[in-house]
Amino acid sequence: DPIAPVRREIERWRNHFGDLDAAAETLADELRMGSGDLYGAIAERLRVTHQLSIRILPVDVMPVALRRLDLHARQLQLSELLDPASRTFAAAFQLGQIEAIGEIDSLVKGGSFTERASERLYRRHLNSYFAAALMMPYRRFVRACEATGYDVELLQRRFGAGFEQVAHRLTTLQRARGLPFFMIRIDRAGQSSKRYAGASASPLVEAEGRCPLWALHSAFDRPGRLVRQLVELDDGRRWFMLARTVSPQGGRIGQVRAQFSVGI
């Protein structure tokens, strides 16, 4: 299983990669000095510094892919199906592949993976981590969390991010007073596709046979709405949980789209 060693390496770092955060913060400060529009600033950086333009293509031209790098045309091609948060993330992901390559290469080598598949998955996780850190720079994000009382929906609006992007970012706050969060993503069958304990050490991340009354499951009955729940375990410990459904980007109008529940 190529995923298992990747999960072990992420948990070894408690899903906090300080070098990537530092690089993303520095770059975010540079980009925001000239523009309040992060997507526009990233696009300008790609164009001026790396000779890559961003082109939004209709679904008829990109019927399957949501993101494609065309080096011959020097274009990062994005599907029109991507919402603004996903477009910014895709642009930040591409910029990270170029400007954070040193930090990412070092972390991948330190993982000592025996399979190339695991190495590729880990590299993708680190690239995604950098993209999220560029959209939600560490210190600025922690201050916003404290100022808003960790209001996830307000954080989404403030940083132009999606619910799942904010949820994942919350699991990375292992320094500077960040509260310990975990994150789980499941499908309707209860199969998990993302599990991050972060600094929480929550047993809920590894729990098998999860209760159907759990907010993570009941969120499917209230799609798009935030479900809140206080969970008490057999040992007396209690965990406050938020859950909401999310759907992956893509798919034409009328098509059945996969749905997941994300809980923190």
Regions from the PLM with identified roles:
Residues 1-264:
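Short juxta-domain linker segments that transition from a proline/glycine-rich
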